[in-house]
């Protein structure tokens, strides 16, 4: 499961935390660290990455909680980004011209 999420651009820690949030619902960073065994500093860094990538939501409160985005939304967001990148590359990368090998004529005395 983690490897499949990594194909969508998540790090191993982000994927682990995404699964934790998805299975348990909204959690604080402390609770995520406790449930996953990942250090709190790494958890908060990974949670920020998940929010930035659209894989989780930050629920602002006295104690901030995080909620995993629905799988469908995660997949749609990543597919949309890939399609945008594909369109950009197709429109902006010039085709490579095939180089023809030249020939040399040697003239001289035998």
Annotate each language-model stretch with its function:
Residues 31-36:
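A short acidic, leucine-rich amphipathic alpha-helix
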